[in-house]
Amino acid sequence: MEQKKTRVTIVGSVYAQPGTQFVYMGRADQCESCTIARVCHNLESGRRYEVVAIRAASHRCPVHHGGAVTVDVAEAPVEMRVSPDIARKNTTIVVKFPECDEACETFAACHPIGVVEGQKYIITDVLEGEAAPCRTGPSPVLVRVVPLPEGLPRYTP
């Protein structure tokens, strides 16, 4: 089993359950006066995280009704659709979202929440399934991606 790199952070108590996923969206205005805000905000904005362990510490929080809890999180894999010419397992990609219409039935899969455009990801799996129709190019393929871990430069064609 692969060991995931974890970070200690603080989340609202309703999210403090192993397996809960969330997308970190950045600081709220109410955080400016908080003495422990740096622990809450040690994540990368726009990325998807999964709670992997709960710690005993709980805190009052002006943002989260019911307080906040210290947890360990890891970056969560995200399923998305990509061009078939780059859909290969263990390939590093720089995400560039296609320019298409939000009314497209696969728009959300091609522009998933929790993936940051312009950042590097590794395709960990090419998933089987029906081809998705696309009006602007070849039918995109469903893959699972994880952010490229820090400190691991990879060749990207």
Swiss-Prot record:
Origin: domain of life: Archaea
**Coiled-coil segments:** none
InterPro entries attached to this UniProt entry: UPF0179
Pfam families hit by this protein: UPF0179
Entries under HAMAP family matching the protein: UPF0179
Q: Which family does it belong to?
A: Belongs to the UPF0179 family.
- What name is this protein filed under? UPF0179 protein Mhun_1135
Name the species this protein comes from.
Answer: Methanospirillum hungatei JF-1 (strain ATCC 27890 / DSM 864 / NBRC 100397 / JF-1)
